[in-house]
């Protein structure tokens, strides 16, 4: 896909980030079913997700677009195969997202609360975990220290300290 870096270079950079920022949220987008993608290529994508331990991945299936080089490439991938691969990668991503969130439940997190809906305030930790907290006071546009209570698409948290 014309990437200007190797797998090894990518892993090296991820390891440097992890060395200096162990709880950094590393995210990625992954296309499955790009023309010519072999089962071995797909399995390597799965291995990279495991090796890096991404906090979140966005998976999408390649779709043919007119007037692109990829549209006329040989070895187009069957839709059923793309669907199966996408489902496997999404499940793996969710597994690693939960691991990441559980690891971050151990330490206080700073959150900028940006939205409110009927006494629930929503924001992101500094390492991109989406959280919500109930509060009687207005938290909108405030940074607060929180304890994450659970995992999920939007994790529940409680305000700690002031």
What is each PLM-predicted segment?
Residues 72-162:
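Terminal RNA-binding accessory module
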Residues 20, 60, 92-96:
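Short hydrophobic alpha-helical module
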Residues 1-56, 62, 67-81:
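Conserved non-cysteine loop/helix-boundary elements of the Radical SAM core domain that shape
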